[in-house]
Structure formats: structure tokens, C-alpha cells
């Protein structure tokens, strides 16, 4: 270590600090020339390598100025020195020293250069001091001129930008950025006013004004587009643009003009399109026609699609208006919320102005609702009345009514209007159509009735008119038909308006495919009874048991007292069924014909039309009543009219029924079809409202005794009329609900005087069967051959009683045969039996009245015969009491009355004819009445008969 230190001392090694201190002062330095400096700068060095060497120097060497480098290096030497390691370490230190010295040299060169620059600066400063006074004023002048030129350049650039603004404005208009275009134009006008001292600005101002007017025109066009297809973003831009222009109220006035024009243009284009499409290549210039004249060129085939498209197009216009109002309501609410949140006094004036504009817009929009709807009504009215719809198909006309009804619903939701214009126009068309339609249907009904064979139409026992397609519309309207689970949903759906439902898409006037084809009417049965074999056997057994001879009954009872066979039914069970409703009356299908079903369907169609268009309810109900009237009149004419039996005076046809039939004949039946057609116009018009009387089909035979003179056909006809009356009774609440209050007396009269008389038609219809089914004339002949002036009381009844009972047994057999073809309701069976028994009893009285001589024993024989007849008859029928039983008994017993009692009896019993009373008095002569008394009694009879003459 001592060797190394001494070696370093001898070599005169110094620290870098000492080397720096020994540098000569700057004054003694020789300034290098520019060439030397350039050469020193251009010497190639590797900065990266140099930096790596410097970085390898330990930081301890630079820690402080008092650091002893020699001591530090000596202390780092290892205890055992190696010459090779020392040399390597020395070389490393040399590299580090060389690198550091190079930096020092570089710093020295930099300092020398700085000294040269400073010297040059001092020299130039001295020169500047000498020249500053001469050039300073010139410099300031140039600077001022420069500033002025910069300002001029800025103005020229602004003017240039203003000149080129029209390009940007055109782009913004193409982009439909109307607020931005107006704002830019207004800013340009404001900027142009700043440079009005330039001569080119006046031309620019004129150009900007023209541009602003052009923007307003395009803005008006954009506003008109709202009328057919409302777009929120588009309308928001338009309103913002008008607000920038300060023309909010003007915009609203223009908007209503555009809506009015849109309605006119829309309907004209729709109708024109269909007219040109149907006209083909004709040369007619339809574009020049007025809308009213154009509507008359619509063909029947294109009428419905054109109407649908017309309503769809008008819906779009009204929907746009609705959405416009909705936009303003939402916008006003947003603005009100904004104003309430910002309470700045400086904006009070602007707020009041905006409030006034909003109030004006709101009133204008509300007033415009009725105006627009009125325009829509007038356009649709013109279209409706432009074509005669009287020859349209029913479904097509119902579709027209449905569309107009939907349109009126739109009007009510749109502005609360009752659509009087539409109602009146569609009422005219409906009445006109319905008269033609009803006239055709009446002619069809006459044709059906004249071709009707009165066969049973097999429908199911569960048949209900609501199952028919024509009455489907009633199912939705009846609350009981809606299940409780569906009621909340339906209630919610009813609160949603059409505008809310179709606000975001769709159209309420889209033609829906008729779903009727997808539905099936499950009303027809494979047979008329739709019952199982047990029910059929019970029904047939009942038929055969209800009115059979006593022998068959006795066998039947005997069977029941023994072992009952399988599927047998007790007589008590059958009788209880009979008392309830003639066996399967309730469980079986109703009795009706194809014609009846057609009338019911027709009534459904009439009600469907009435439901859609309530203003013509009275006309529809009046025509419905004519359908029932004609059906009733036809049944009476075919099966109930018989002047011979009407003259019996038994009151078969009630006064109400006769009044009804006379009214129908006078108001509905054309009795002059075969007469000379020449006559007054008034008579011809009246006859147009009438229908010829129907004629019974030649296929229906009413003269055959084996079929009980067409009893099956009579039952089907009469009971189908009763069924039809029941359906009218069922529909009465629905008809009453739509009938105008002023016309309700007509409906009440129709039900009380016409519908309720259907049951009364049974008597005259079945009376004819009862009058022909039993040979009453033969019974009179047999009674005439009986000797009544016998002297002893007889114990055996006369043969005419057995003959009459055989007639009843034969009647029962035929009735049973008929019941196999057609179910005979209990009430019909009872009426037939009542008629037969009443006629038989009256025939007995007639026979007794023909007796010339009769003794007391003969009267007793009459009582014996009648009691025998009653006893046997009561076994054939369950009807109690026997009709006209007292009529016979009273007449027989009157023989025994004294003079005074008989006179009183004659005055009290006016149900007997003059012949009956006269014969009674004559037979009693010589027995207990003398001639004087006879004259007195005959005079009393004459007094009673005189008012009848």
C-alpha cells in the first residue's frame, strides 16, 4: 500500500477539483476560430458508450468535496495483491477518468463558446444604441399598419364565410335541421349588420333574407308532412324552428290549413286511384272532376275496398292530429316543470310570452278537433251517398255498416261527436237498402213456404239460436256469457281507446279475414230426437199407452204386476212424464222446419244490422215483425182456415187472433196479384209493400185419413210457429233496449197482439183434424135409428156408443202412427183429444136434439149411453174433466124440469142453439108441459134468438 501511495505522489496525481482550479482565467484564453469550433463539434463520438462509462462510476466519488479518493481506493484493495487484477482495475479507472475528462473538456468548450457569444452581444448592443433613434418611429408605424391589416383580414375572412353560408344552409335543409339552419341564418344576418359599412354587405343581406324566406317555405312543406305521418323528432325540429322565428301561432294556423288540405287530397287520391283502376284505359280525365262527381264513378266491386282504404287514410290523418296534441301536452308539461324549477326574475317576460303561446296553441288544437272531424264526416258522407247500395249482398252491406260504425266510434273518441252527419247518411242508405233487402227476403220466404213440405228439421236437443252465426254478435254483448276469469281483461280492454291501441302501429280499418269459415254450427242432429234406445222405447211405449184400448192397458198392467221386463217403464212413470211435458218434450229437440231456421237466421241478420246502426232500429223491428206476421199468416192459411168449422161458433179463433189475421191481411198480403195491373201510382206503391198470399205445396196432402189429414205436417207447422214465437219472446229485451222510446208502443203491441197469439193458432189447426178424424155424421145416423120413447128402463147401452168408441180407438192408433214420424207434444195431444171429445159431446147433444119423441125411460137411456161413453172414454185419456161433459148432462137433465124452471133454465143457458132449445120444449110437450106452456117457452126462445139475427 505504501508503495502505491508513493508511486502516486511521484506522478503528481491530482484530483479533478484541483485540475479545475489550475485552469487559467478566461482573459488568458485564446478564442478558438470558427473552423476549430466546427471541427470540435463535428468529431464523431459515441454518446451511448460514453454514457455507459460515466454511469459505471460509483456515486461515492461525488458524495462530497472532502472525499479522499486515494484512501478509498487503497482500502478497497484485497489483502493479497495481484498485479493482473490491479492492472485491470487501473485500466477501468483510466476509462472512467478519460470519460469524465472528456465531459469536462466539453464543458470547457461550451463555456468558451458562451464567452464568445457574450462578447458578440455586447458589440451588437453598442451598434444598436447608435441606430435605435432613427428606426424606432418607422417600426411603430409598421406595427400599427400590421394590426390594421390583421383586422381587415379577419373582416374579409368573415365576409367570405358569410358569402359561402348558403352552401351550408342548403346542406342543413337537406338534413332537415331546420332549427340549425334558421339559427345560422339569423347569426349571419346579425354578423352582416356589423359589416354594413362594406358595399358588398347590402347584397349579402338581401341574399340572406331570401334564404330565410326559402327556409320558411321548406319549413311549411315539412309541417304539411306531419298531417299524414307524424314523427316526433321531425315535428320537434319544426316547432323549434318556428319558435326561433317567433311564429308559433302562425305555425298552428298553417298546421290546421294543412290538415284540412290533407283530408281533401287524401280522399281524392284514394277514390281517384280506384276510379282509374276500374276505368282501365279510358280517356276520361278523372283528375278534373270534383270529388262528389268522382264518387259516382266507383263500381260496386271496388266500393268496399275503396271505403276501407278511405277510412284507413283518414285514420292516419286523425291519428297524426291526435299525436300532435299529445306532443304539445307533453311539451307543455315539460316546460312547466322547467319554469317551476328555475325562478329567475329576468325570464318573467319570456315565460309570460311562452305561456300565452301555449294557451293559444291548446285552444286552437281543441277547436280544430271538431273542424277536422266535420271535414272527415262530409267526405265520407259524399262517398256513401255516391253509390246506390240497395243491390249489395248482405255481408257486404254489413261490412259497410261495420266500417262506418267503427268510424263513428273513432269520431266519438276523437272529439266526443255523435257523428250526426254520418248517422243520417248511413241511415238513408240503410233504410233504402233494407227496404229492397226485406222485399227480396219476403219473396224468398213466400217461395220457401210454398215449397215447404213441413218435414222436421233435425236439430240437437241443446239447440239454441245463439249457436247460429247470425247471433254470434249477441254472445259477446251478454254479460252472463263472459267467464269471471275473463271479465277483468275485458274490462281493461274496454277502457283502451282506438287511438291508444293503434297509436304505435296498425289500423282499426284493416280488412279482417272472415272467421266464420273457421267456426262450425253444431246444431244439426242425425235424427229429430237425439235420444238413446231406452228413451226411444219409453217414448214409443208412452205413445202407444196414452190412448189405447182397455185390453192393451190391462195386459200392460198385468205385465207390470209380474216380473218387469228389461228396459220397461212403469205406467206411473210414463204418466208423470206426460204430466211434466209429454214424455221427452223438454229433453228433445224443438220442432221446426228448414224455413223456420231460415227465418230465425234472417232475424239474426236483421238484429245484426240493427245492432250496428241503432237509428234504424224501428224500421228493422217493423220488418222483423212482418217476417213473423207472414209466417203466422201462412200457417193459418195452409192449416187453420176452414169457414165450415169457423161457423160452429165454438170460439176456435179468439177475437185477438182474428184481429191479428185481419190486420196482417190488410197491411201485408197482396190480394190483387191476379187483377189488372193498371191502376194509380199510389196503389202500385202500396202494393209494392205487400206480398202475395202463399199457396200450400201440392206435395203436402191434407186429405188422407190414414195420416190424420196431414197431422204430422200440421204439428210441424204449428209448433214451428210456436218455436218462432218463443225466440221472439227471448229477443224482446234486446229489441226493447234499442227501440226508440217513442216507438216502444209498437213493439209492445206487436208482442201482445201478434207473438202471443201463436199458441192460439193451435185450436183452429187441430180442430180440423179432430173434426175429420171421427165420423160424427155416422154417429148421428145411428142415433136417429134409436127408439127413445121406450116404456121401460134399459140396462144395455145403444150401439152408437160402441161405434163412437171404436172411432176414438182408431183415432188413437193413427195418432200413434203419426207420433212415430213426428214427436207430438203433450199440449198438442191434449188439444186434439179435447177437440175430439168436445165435438163428440156436441154431436151427442145434436143427436138428442133430433129426437122427435122421447119418454122418461128414453131420457134415462140417454144418460146410460152417455155414462157408458164417459166410462170407456176416461180409460182412453187422462184428460180431466171431460170437455163439455156438463153440456151433455145438463141438456139431458133439462127434460125433467117444470115449466117455470125450464123457462129460467132457457134464459140462463144460452150456449145451446135455438134448435136444441126448441126440440127440448117440443119433446116435453104432452109429458109435463102443455101447449100453453109450450107457446110461452117458444116465445122466450124467440126473444133470446132475436138479438142474434
UniProtKB/Swiss-Prot annotation:
Residues 82-104, 198-226 form a coiled coil. GO terms for cellular component: EARP complex; membrane; recycling endosome. Keywords: Coiled coil, Endosome, Membrane, Protein transport, Transport. Residues 1-28, 509-581 are annotated as: Disordered. Residues 569-581 have a biased composition (Basic and acidic residues). It is found in: Recycling endosome; Membrane. It comes from the Eukaryota. The keyword Coiled coil applies. This is Syndetin. The gene is VPS50.
Amino acid at each position: 500500500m505504501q508503495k502505491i501511495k508513493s508511486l502516486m505522489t511521484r506522478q503528481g496525481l491530482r484530483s479533478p477539483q484541483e485540475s479545475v482550479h489550475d485552469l487559467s482565467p478566461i482573459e488568458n484564453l485564446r478564442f478558438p476560430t470558427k473552423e476549430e469550433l466546427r471541427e470540435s463539434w463535428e468529431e464523431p463520438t459515441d454518446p451511448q458508450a460514453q454514457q455507459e462509462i460515466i454511469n459505471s462510476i460509483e456515486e461515492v466519488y461525488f458524495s462530497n468535496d472532502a472525499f479522499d479518493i486515494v484512501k478509498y481506493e487503497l482500502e478497497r484493495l484485497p489483502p493479497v495483491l495481484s498485479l493482473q487484477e490491479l492492472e485491470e482495475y487501473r485500466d477501468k479507472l483510466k476509462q472512467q477518468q478519460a470519460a469524465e475528462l472528456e465531459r469536462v473538456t466539453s464543458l470547457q468548450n461550451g463555456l468558451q463558446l458562451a464567452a464568445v457569444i457574450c462578447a458578440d452581444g455586447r458589440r451588437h448592443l453598442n451598434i444598436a444604441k447608435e441606430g435605435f433613434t432613427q428606426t424606432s418611429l418607422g417600426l411603430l408605424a409598421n406595427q400599427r399598419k400590421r394590426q390594421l391589416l390583421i383586422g381587415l383580414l379577419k373582416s374579409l375572412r368573415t365576409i367570405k364565410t358569410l358569402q359561402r353560408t348558403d352552401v351550408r344552409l342548403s346542406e342543413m335543409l337537406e338534413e332537415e335541421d331546420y332549427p340549425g339552419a334558421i339559427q345560422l341564418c339569423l347569426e349571419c344576418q346579425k354578423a352582416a349588420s356589423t359589416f354594413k359599412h362594406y358595399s358588398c354587405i347590402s347584397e349579402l343581406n338581401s341574399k340572406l333574407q331570401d334564404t330565410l324566406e326559402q327556409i320558411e317555405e321548406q319549413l311549411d312543406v315539412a309541417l304539411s308532412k306531419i298531417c299524414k305521418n307524424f314523427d316526433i323528432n321531425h315535428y320537434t325540429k319544426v316547432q323549434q324552428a318556428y319558435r326561433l322565428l317567433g311564429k308559433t301561432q302562425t305555425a298552428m294556423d298553417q298546421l290546421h290549413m294543412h290538415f284540412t288540405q290533407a283530408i281533401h287530397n287524401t280522399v281524392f287520391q284514394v277514390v281517384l286511384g280506384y276510379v282509374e283502376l276500374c276505368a282501365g284505359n279510358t280517356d276520361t280525365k278523372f283528375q278534373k272532376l270534383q270529388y262528389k262527381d268522382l264518387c259516382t264513378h266507383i263500381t260496386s266491386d271496388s266500393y268496399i275496398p275503396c271505403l276501407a282504404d278511405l277510412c284507413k287514410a283518414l285514420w292516419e290523418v286523425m291519428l297524426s292530429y291526435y299525436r300532435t296534441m299529445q306532443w304539445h301536452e307533453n311539451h307543455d308539461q315539460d316546460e312547466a316543470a322547467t319554469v317551476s324549477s328555475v325562478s329567475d326574475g329576468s325570464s318573467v317576460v319570456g315565460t309570460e310570452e311562452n305561456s300565452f303561446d301555449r294557451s293559444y296553441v291548446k285552444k286552437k288544437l281543441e277547436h280544430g278537433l271538431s273542424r277536422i272531424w266535420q271535414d272527415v264526416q262530409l267526405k265520407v258522407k259524399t262517398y256513401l251517398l255516391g253509390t246506390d247500395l240497395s243491390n249489395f249482398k248482405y255481408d257486404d252491406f254489413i261490412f259497410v255498416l261495420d266500417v262506418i260504425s267503427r268510424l263513428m266510434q273513432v269520431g266519438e273518441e276523437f272529439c266526443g261527436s255523435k257523428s250526426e252527419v254520418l248517422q243520417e247518411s248511413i241511415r238513408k242508405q240503410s233504410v233504402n237498402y233494407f227496404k229492397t233487402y226485406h222485399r227480396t227476403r219476403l219473396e224468398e220466404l213466400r217461395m220457401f213456404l210454398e215449397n215447404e213440405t213441413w218435414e222436421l228439421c233435425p236439430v240437437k236437443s241443446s239447440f239454441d239460436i245463439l249457436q247460429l252465426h247470425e247471433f254470434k254478435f249477441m254472445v259477446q254483448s251478454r254479460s252472463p256469457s263472459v267467464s269471471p276469469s275473463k271479465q277483468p281483461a275485458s274490462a281493461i280492454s274496454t277502457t283502451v281507446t282506438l287511438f291508444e291501441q293503434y297509436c304505435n302501429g296498425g289500423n282499426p280499418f284493416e280488412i279482417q279475414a272472415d272467421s266464420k269459415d273457421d267456426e262450425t254450427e253444431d246444431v244439426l242432429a242425425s235424427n229429430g230426437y237425439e235420444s238413446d234406445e231406452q228413451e226411444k222405447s219409453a217414448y214409443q211405449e208412452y205413445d202407444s199407452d196414452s190412448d189405447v184400448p182397455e185390453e192393451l192397458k190391462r195386459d200392460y198392467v198385468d205385465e207390470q204386476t209380474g216380473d218387469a221386463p228389461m228396459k220397461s217403464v212403469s205406467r206411473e212413470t210414463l204418466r208423470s212424464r206426460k204430466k211434466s211435458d209429454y214424455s221427452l218434450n223438454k229433453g228433445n229437440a224443438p220442432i221446426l222446419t228448414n224455413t223456420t231456421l231460415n227465418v230465425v237466421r234472417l232475424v239474426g241478420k236483421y238484429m245484426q244490422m240493427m245492432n250496428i246502426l241503432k237509428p234504424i232500429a224501428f224500421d228493422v223491428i217493423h220488418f222483423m215483425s212482418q217476417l213473423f206476421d207472414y209466417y203466422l199468416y201462412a200457417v193459418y192459411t195452409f192449416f187453420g182456415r176452414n169457414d165450415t168449422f169457423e161457423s160452429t161458433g165454438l170460439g176456435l179463433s179468439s177475437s185477438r187472433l182474428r184481429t191479428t189475421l185481419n190486420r196482417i191481411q190488410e197491411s201485408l198480403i197482396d190480394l190483387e196479384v191476379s187483377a189488372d195491373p193498371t191502376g194509380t201510382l199510389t196503389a202500385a206503391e202500396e202494393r209494392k209493400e205487400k206480398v202475395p198470399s202463399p199457396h200450400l205445396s201440392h206435395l203436402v196432402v191434407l186429405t188422407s185419413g190414414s195420416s190424420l189429414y196431414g197431422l204430422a205436417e200440421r204439428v210441424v207447422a204449428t209448433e214451428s210457429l210456436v218455436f218462432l214465437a218463443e225466440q221472439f219472446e227471448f229477443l224482446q229485451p234486446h229489441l226493447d233496449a234499442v227501440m226508440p222510446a217513442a216507438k216502444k208502443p209498437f213493439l209492445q203491441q206487436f208482442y201482445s197482439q201478434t207473438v202471443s197469439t201463436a199458441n192460439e193458432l193451435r185450436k183452429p189447426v187441430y180442430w180440423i183434424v179432430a173434426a175429420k178424424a171421427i165420423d160424427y155424421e155416422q154417429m148421428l145416423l145411428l142415433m136417429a135409428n134409436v127408439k127413445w120413447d121406450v116404456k121401460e128402463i134399459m140396462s144395455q147401452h145403444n150401439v152408437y156408443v160402441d161405434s163412437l168408441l171404436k172411432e176414438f180407438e182408431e183415432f188413437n192408433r193413427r195418432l200413434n202412427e203419426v207420433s212415430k214420424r213426428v214427436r207430438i207434444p203433450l199440449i198438442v195431444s191434449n188439444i186434439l183429444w179435447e177437440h175430439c171429445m168436445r165435438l163428440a159431446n156436441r154431436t151427442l147433444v145434436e143427436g138428442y136434439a133430433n129426437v122427435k119423441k122421447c119418454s122418461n125411460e128414453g131420457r134415462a137411456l140417454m144418460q146410460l149411453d152417455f155414462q157408458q161413453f164417459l166410462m170407456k172414454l176416461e180409460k182412453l185419456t187422462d184428460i180431466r174433466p171431460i170437455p163439455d161433459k156438463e153440456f151433455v148432462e145438463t141438456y139431458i137433465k133439462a127434460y125433467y124440469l117444470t115449466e117455470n124452471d125450464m123457462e129460467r133454465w132457457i134464459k140462463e143457458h144460452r150456449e145451446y142453439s135455438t134448435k136444441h132449445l126448441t126440440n127440448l120444449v117440443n119433446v116435453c110437450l104432452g109429458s109435463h108441459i102443455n101447449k100453453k106452456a109450450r107457446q110461452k117457452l117458444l116465445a122466450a126462445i124467440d126473444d133470446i134468438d132475436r138479438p142474434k139475427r
